[in-house]
């Protein structure tokens, strides 16, 4: 039995609140249960120096957690003077996931920076960030299209979403919350596109290695979960 009482293939309640920020070109407050992440997409009329005059744009991401997003207050990384390895890993993952579905030449020589700020954490912050970041990116591109800067359908090639899976109490489960994640025998994150393409898989065994059969079970849970998330994205942007 899962601590939340959910079935093995049951995700937490997911919601997307678009246009959460009045300043950003695109924004979304995404909720995966008690994990809440504010995703904002900001347009910059420039590209990194190494891309200058290259005829294409760039999409990048930054990730952070508010000091009291967790049970005990964490020190701000800015006050510590450096980002943790975890933060750097997650923001690179978010950026890679978004770029997998963007036609960078169609964006022109512009950069979209997506900031994912965790307001409240209860497991799965990176997967919620990726899934919500896609909505924010979509709305930023829609803002640009309204000003004749790009064609949305030419720049954004597909959906992308992410979900965590793991083996908890010897059972494969989807969308782990913190209690499950901290006690899981295996923990994995999957990033996939709307057409079923795999962007990234991260999987780790805690003590006991997992079998190929167990991995196949996690993969199936992830595939079905991400398909659900992408349908939710479609409903959100249609509203």
UniProtKB/Swiss-Prot annotation:
Which reaction(s) does the protein catalyse, per the Swiss-Prot or TrEMBL entry? tRNA(n+1) + phosphate = tRNA(n) + a ribonucleoside 5'-diphosphate
One GO molecular-function entry: 3'-5'-RNA exonuclease activity
Question: What GO biological process terms are annotated to this protein in UniProt?
Answer: rRNA catabolic process; rRNA processing; tRNA processing
What keywords would UniProt list here?
Answer: Nucleotidyltransferase, RNA-binding, rRNA processing, Transferase, tRNA processing, tRNA-binding
Q: Provide the binding site for phosphate.
A: 86, 124-126
The EC number on file is 2.7.7.56
Q: Domain of life, per the record?
A: Bacteria
What this protein is reported to do is described as: Phosphorolytic 3'-5' exoribonuclease that plays an important role in tRNA 3'-end maturation. Removes nucleotide residues following the 3'-CCA terminus of tRNAs; can also add nucleotides to the ends of RNA molecules by using nucleoside diphosphates as substrates, but this may not be physiologically important. Probably plays a role in initiation of 16S rRNA degradation (leading to ribosome degradation) during starvation.
Concerning its family, UniProt says: Belongs to the RNase PH family.
Task: Describe the subunit structure.
Answer: Homohexameric ring arranged as a trimer of dimers.
This protein's name: Ribonuclease PH
* Organism name: Sinorhizobium medicae (strain WSM419)
Question: What is the taxonomic lineage of the source species?
Answer: Bacteria, Pseudomonadati, Pseudomonadota, Alphaproteobacteria, Hyphomicrobiales
Gene this protein is translated from:
rph
């Amino acid at each position: 039995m899962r601590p939340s009482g959910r079935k093995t293939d049951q995700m937490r309640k997911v919601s997307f609140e678009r246009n959460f920020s009045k300043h950003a070109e695109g924004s979304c407050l995404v909720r995966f249960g008690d994990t809440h992440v504010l995703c904002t997409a900001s347009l910059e009329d420039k590209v990194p120096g190494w891309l200058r005059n290259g005829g294409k744009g760039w999409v990048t991401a930054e990730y952070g957690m508010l000091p009291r997003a967790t049970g005990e207050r964490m020190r701000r990384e800015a006050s510590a003077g450096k980002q943790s390895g975890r933060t750097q890993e997650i923001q690179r993952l978010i950026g890679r996931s978004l770029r997998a579905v963007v036609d960078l030449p169609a964006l022109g020589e512009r950069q979209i920076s997506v900031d994912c700020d965790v307001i409240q954490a209860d497991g799965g912050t990176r997967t919620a960030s990726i899934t919500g970041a896609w909505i924010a990116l979509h709305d930023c591109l829609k803002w640009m299209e309204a000003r004749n800067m790009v064609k949305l359908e030419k720049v954004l090639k597909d959906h992308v979403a992410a979900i965590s899976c793991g083996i908890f109490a010897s059972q494969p489960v989807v969308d782990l919350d913190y209690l499950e994640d901290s006690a899981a025998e295996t923990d994995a994150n999957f990033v996939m596109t709307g057409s079923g393409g795999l962007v990234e898989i991260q999987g780790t065994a805690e003590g006991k290695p997992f079998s190929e059969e167990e991995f196949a079970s996690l993969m199936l849970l992830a595939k079905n979960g991400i398909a659900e998330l992408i349908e939710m994205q479609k409903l959100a942007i249609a509203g």
